[in-house]
């Protein structure tokens, strides 16, 4: 699959995110990209051999070659244990706090083995300010007035463990890992379903 990016910045960001999840995706694994956005990260994984399905609450895809299903933000329209890996890349902070746990439960339900999550993880007041600005901007982009919430790394880990997920990997990412004008504190998490 040849991927045509609309900008070098998006190409860089997408390849970076795909590079973070790729070590946890075996060749020919089935992957669900929840909150897929433009679909570029999923396309990068598909180009590496993964079988990828995209889903989101709105259709913002630029990648049309991969299968896609809309979902209502609460219930993923897939069978139990359908995917090897379910990834939520910079998605959960856009989900209202009271719906974060149920969405994690849904992601775990449709996964056979693991979840991979990339999240903004504020560490100070400047991070919280920048995150709030980002959240408001994105809400305007998709025409939503729903609440959103950013958690620290410790808060995310507490939530994951509270859902019965095993945190196998938690890594702080560099502030400028995506772009110089997005100096957000971010983290990557690999979660496994209990045996």
Question: How would you label these PLM feature ranges?
Answer:
Residues 87:
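A conserved beta-strand element that flanks and buttresses the S-adenosyl-L-methionine
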Residues 10-27:
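Conserved alpha-helix/loop element of class I SAM-dependent methyltransferases that forms part
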Residues 28-37:
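Conserved class I S-adenosyl-L-methionine
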Residues 41, 118-179:
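C-terminal alpha-helical "lid/dimerization" subdomain adjacent to the S-adenosyl-L-methionine
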Residues 93-95:
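A short His-aromatic
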Residues 38-75:
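Class I SAM-dependent methyltransferase SAM/SAH-binding core
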Residues 101-115:
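A short glycine-rich, Lys/Arg-flanked "PGG" loop and its adjoining helix->strand segment in the class I
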Residues 176-195:
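Core SAM-dependent methyltransferase catalytic element
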């Amino acid at each position: 699959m040849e991927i045509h990016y609309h900008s070098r910045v998006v190409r860089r960001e997408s390849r970076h995110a795909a590079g973070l999840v790729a070590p946890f995706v075996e060749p020919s694994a089935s992957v669900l990209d929840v909150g897929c956005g433009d679909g570029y990260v999923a396309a990068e994984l598909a180009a590496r051999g993964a079988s990828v399905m995209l889903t989101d609450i709105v259709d913002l895809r630029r990648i049309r070659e991969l299968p896609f299903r809309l979902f209502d933000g609460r219930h993923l329209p897939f069978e139990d244990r359908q995917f090897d890996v379910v990834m939520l890349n910079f998605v959960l902070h856009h989900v209202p706090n009271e719906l974060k746990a149920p969405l994690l439960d849904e992601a775990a339900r449709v996964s056979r083995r693991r979840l991979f999550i990339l999240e903004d993880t504020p560490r100070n007041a400047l991070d919280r300010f920048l995150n709030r600005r980002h959240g408001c901007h994105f809400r305007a982009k998709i025409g939503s007035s729903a609440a959103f919430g950013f958690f620290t790394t410790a808060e995310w880990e507490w939530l994951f463990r509270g859902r019965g997920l095993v945190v196998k990997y938690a890594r702080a990412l560099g502030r400028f890992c995506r772009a110089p004008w997005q100096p957000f504190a971010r983290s990557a998490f690999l979660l496994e379903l209990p045996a």
